[in-house]
């Protein structure tokens, strides 16, 4: 598994700051929330995955470049 550099992680943190609201458009995972489910980005982990708290109660992470999602509202909390 390839882990992103510190610079790449920092770029993801700027692109998806804590509090950013996202909407799931598609995810190839049997545990995925339904398409259209919205959630809040809680942070970015060391693997470059977005830690998301979904409105369904799930906390499944998003993988930028693999999962399909859109930003609904940009966050700004640190």
Please give the residue ranges for each predicted region.
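Basic/aromatic-rich interaction segments and small domains that mediate binding to polyanionic partners
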Residues: 2-77
